């Protein structure tokens, strides 16, 4: 979020350009989870979860909160009006627990700046390194059993953001609720309140299918039409 804000501040410091007011975020798989965080309001949910999990560290958590505000308490990214999620495991995936996934996770490393910040934060809270159950790879945190993904799934999406879901299912047969794209189950990708939900017979790489591309174009085209109509209405009212 910080990087996006810095980019916008550089090219549009006054944030008066139309592109700064009608941002569309599109995220696939874990990118979809990150996209959701960018349009969510954490409130005190993350802090409360930490205090509930580690009551003995409650005072230290409150003491370090101001310094790590961007991690523990954040608001939706300013200017975003639309979010599109493709095969996003909002509630995790059981496949993250598989041995092959954990093997691949050993090669996944967070950026050094984030690792340093998290390391400093946990030292302040626990006076030692990260507790064993707190993992440092995105793959681990996508497990449906992971407490992190469970907390993040509870964060409310901004009312100012219209969001859409594009979901894959490997097989057209059987109940939709029991389907999966081979990696992410339908129940994890499904989001209540979505403006639309497009389910496509596809594997996890649903973003590569013609149906998904057509759906993306339709959403973006309709968004432009809506913005144009809104401008026209405002112009008429002004006259």
Q: Where do the model's predicted regions map?
A:
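C-terminal catalytic-base region of ester-bond hydrolases, centering on the histidine
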Residues: 100-108, 113-239
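Serine-dependent carboxylesterase/thioesterase catalytic core
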Residues: 1-135, 181
């Amino acid at each position: 979020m910080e990087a996006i804000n810095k980019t916008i501040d550089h090219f549009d410091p006054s944030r008066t350009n139309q592109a700064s007011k009608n941002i569309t975020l599109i995220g696939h798989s874990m990118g979809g989870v990150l996209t959701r965080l960018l349009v969510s309001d954490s409130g005190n949910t993350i802090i409360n979860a930490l205090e509930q999990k580690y009551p003995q560290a409650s005072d230290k958590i409150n003491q370090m909160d101001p310094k790590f505000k961007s991690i523990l308490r954040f608001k939706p990214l300013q200017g975003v009006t639309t979010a599109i999620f493709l095969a996003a495991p909002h509630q995790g995936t059981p496949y993250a627990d598989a041995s092959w996934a954990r093997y691949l996770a050993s090669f996944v490393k967070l950026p050094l700046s984030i690792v340093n910040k998290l390391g400093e934060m946990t030292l302040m809270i626990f006076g030692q390194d990260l507790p064993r159950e707190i993992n440092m790879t995105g793959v681990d945190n996508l497990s449906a059993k992971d407490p992190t993904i469970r907390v993040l799934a509870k964060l409310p999406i901004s009312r100012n953001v219209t969001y859409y879901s594009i979901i894959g299912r490997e097989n057209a047969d059987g109940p939709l609720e029991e389907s999966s794209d081979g990696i992410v189950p339908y129940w994890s990708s499904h989001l209540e309140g979505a403006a639309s939900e497009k389910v496509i017979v596809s594997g996890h790489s649903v973003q590569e299918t013609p149906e998904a591309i057509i759906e993306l174009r339709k959403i973006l085209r309709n968004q432009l039409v809506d913005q144009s109509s809104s401008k026209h209405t405002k112009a008429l009212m002004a006259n």
